[in-house]
Regions:
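Domain-level detector for long C-terminal conserved domains
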Residues: 1-440
Length: 440
């Protein structure tokens, strides 16, 4: 449901390399990112570069991840949301099992709108689902319907989370805080994770709530984290929560170390700052000043001191009635994005694109997740000679030890060499979160 490396400005990565041709068009392939962070970051930074047509081709392993990426991108692009409002909606939906009531109401309303995209009922110029078959489009529509209904009915996502934790820890469940503290101090701290506090990490491991603020209590379930959603008659079946319960969503936006006036910010504060900056830059094409960021921040939350309690069961189980959200089909809620478009491809494309001549040597840049590296032989034919290929490393995976990190890098080097990739720079398994190659 999220990635394990920071958001990247793709144009910056391309421009840094002299091996790549800097043309008027940039064709990008993103495989298994788990979220839309690289697209958001690149959109935000576009004003820093000359005009260029950028097409993002995205392959995710599940339709739920496609739907979440659509929702998160839509939140960044929605023109009627306040800056802080959009930022916190994004982070809560992205990384929390429970969200504030205001966020839940937004999720209900927005899911109702997004379910019309797969059916082409509303025009969404920045997004294309044309490569999906009718069956997959129907499933996407069903996922949005499920989110709308499940948010109102407040399905017990925290219970699903606890069941996963119990199954994972078994006899160690009663001593879980000790397990979480050990993972934090002995693993994460040794890998240069600076702004993530032990309080944030422990609270997330216990309850699945990563990002918290003083204002508002997270009391409504976030069904966008539920896996394998299938419409069945008038209702739905799903596999509860099957996602990450050990690493966390902190490393995509909240891993940069920042100190101001000797105050050390939490991962939540860094993530809020980075998302706020990205949304502001997408909207205004201007940098965000630090004073504006500071105006949204309460000084009492510095130094990782903020702790929250879980809401009462009665509050969590309260149900909402369905109210059909009325909006005009020609009322476009998103800001106009010129020269950039996101095209989603089905997961079967991992095997089929190499057989289509129009995709041979098509891409100038490829980013691939750490758990998709076995697909490199299928994907390398799709990139141009001299293209940049970035591969996510496993630095932030808590369950892996240093030996595992080194073995992964060794295997990655072997796969790369066999498929015509050369390292742009040396790879340090413990320090680096990304490996950089080019196609020779």
């Amino acid at each position: 449901m999220w990635g394990y490396s920071p958001a990247l400005d793709i144009q910056l990565e391309v421009n840094k390399s002299a091996t790549n041709c800097l043309g008027e068009c940039l064709e990008v392939l993103i495989v298994g990112a788990g979220d839309a962070r690289h697209i958001v970051k690149t959109l935000a930074s576009s004003y820093l570069y000359r005009d260029r047509i950028i097409t993002y081709h995205v392959i995710e392993s599940t339709l739920e991840q496609v739907a979440r990426s659509m929702l998160l991108l839509s939140t960044c692009l929605e023109k009627d949301l306040g800056l802080q409002e959009a930022t916190r909606y994004y982070l809560e939906i992205y990384g929390n099992t429970l969200v504030r009531p205001a966020t839940a109401k937004y999720l209900v309303k927005h899911s109702d709108r997004l379910m019309d995209i797969p059916t082409n009922t509303i025009d969404c110029t920045w997004l294309s689902l044309e490569n999906f078959k009718r069956r997959d489009k129907d499933r996407l529509e069903g996922i949005f319907k499920f989110w709308e209904r499940a948010t109102r009915e407040n399905i017990p996502v925290v219970e699903y989370w606890d069941q996963r934790v119990r199954k994972s820890l078994k006899t160690r469940y009663d001593y879980r805080d000790g397990v979480f503290d050990w993972d934090y101090h002995m693993v994460l701290k040794s890998r240069d994770v600076s702004n993530l506090t032990v309080q944030e990490y422990r609270f997330w491991r216990n309850n699945g709530i990563a990002f918290t603020w003083l204002e508002g209590e997270p009391a409504r379930s976030n069904p966008t984290l539920v896996s394998n959603i299938i419409q069945h008659g008038p209702g739905f079946i799903h596999y509860a929560y099957l996602g990450d319960i050990t690493n966390g969503p902190f490393f995509t936006w909240g891993s940069e170390e920042v100190k101001i006036n000797q105050n050390k910010y939490r991962a939540t504060d860094i993530a809020e700052r980075e998302i706020m900056r990205s949304i502001h830059e997408i909207r205004t094409k201007e940098p965000l000043c630090d004073e504006l960021i500071a105006s949204h921040r309460d000084s009492s939350i510095l130094n990782g001191t903020l702790m929250i309690e879980m809401p009462s069961n009665a509050m969590e189980q309260e149900s909402w009635k369905r109210e059909r959200n009325k909006y005009r089909k020609d009322d476009i809620p998103w800001i106009d994005i010129k020269n950039q478009k996101v095209i989603f491809h089905p997961v079967t494309s991992l095997e089929t694109l190499k057989c289509k001549t129009e995709y041979t040597s098509k891409f100038d840049f490829m980013w691939i997740a750490h758990n998709m590296t076995k697909q490199l032989p299928n994907l390398i034919p799709l990139v141009k000679k001299g293209a940049i290929v970035l591969v996510e490393l496993r630095k932030y995976l808590v369950e892996l030890r240093e030996e595992d990190l080194e073995n992964f890098v060794k295997e990655l080097r072997d796969i790369g060499r066999k498929n015509g990739l050369r390292e742009i720079s040396d790879i340090n398994a413990k320090k680096h979160y990304i490996a950089k190659f080019y196609k020779c």
